[in-house]
Amino acid sequence: MKKFFISVVFIVLLTFTTFINSATAAKLDDNVRTLPLNEDKEVVLTIKEYTQGKREFTNVCSQCHVGGITKTNPDVSLDPETLALAYPARDNIEGLIDYMQNPTTYDGFIEISEFHPSIKSADIYPEMRNLTEDDLYAIAGYILVQPKVLGKQWGGGKIFR
């Protein structure tokens, strides 16, 4: 009886996992995953990169940026408009990677690596130590896909939840 119960639970979990992954893949078609690489080029994020970005964002970034908001400064979120108005613009993959490597204030004038987790400050923020270039690319891609999936809920704060 115990083996039967374990088998049933395993089959249910396997079916549920397969269904969830299929649903995620269906929502994230090529159009949703097409993102600006920089000011001139676009790229299509793979499902694998999206999944990797989601995992790394959840593990490293979500303690301050859950749902695309910024807990320490709610005026500066990860929504597309806010990212586009930053200087330099952070509404593309290369811009976000640059920020994760060397963060600056919203106007771009002051370096803030000792206050914001980054690759440059990995000695202060150990969660950044093991992130590779591929991880940064995936995180940036995840950040840029989320507004297409969640709309104004991403970075919109309490009012949109």
Curated annotation (Swiss-Prot):
Entry keyword annotation includes tRNA processing: no
UniProt keyword list? Electron transport, Heme, Iron, Membrane, Metal-binding, Photosynthesis, Photosystem II, Signal, Thylakoid, Transport
Superkingdom, natural source: Bacteria
A GO molecular-function annotation: iron ion binding
Say where the protein is mainly found.
membrane
UniProt cofactor note = Binds 1 heme c group covalently per subunit.
- Asked if the record carries the keyword Coiled coil, the reply is no
Q: What start and end residues bound the annotated signal peptide?
A: 1-25
Q: Where in the cell is it found?
A: Cellular thylakoid membrane
- CC annotations in GO: photosystem II; plasma membrane-derived thylakoid membrane
> Which cofactor is recorded for it?
heme c
Concerning NCBIfam families, the annotation shows: PS_II_C550
Family membership: Belongs to the cytochrome c family. PsbV subfamily.
Name-wise, this protein is Photosystem II extrinsic protein V
Q: Which species is this record about?
A: Trichodesmium erythraeum (strain IMS101)
Query: In the record, what lineage is assigned to the organism producing the protein?
Result: Bacteria, Bacillati, Cyanobacteriota, Cyanophyceae, Oscillatoriophycideae
Q: What gene name does this entry carry?
A: psbV
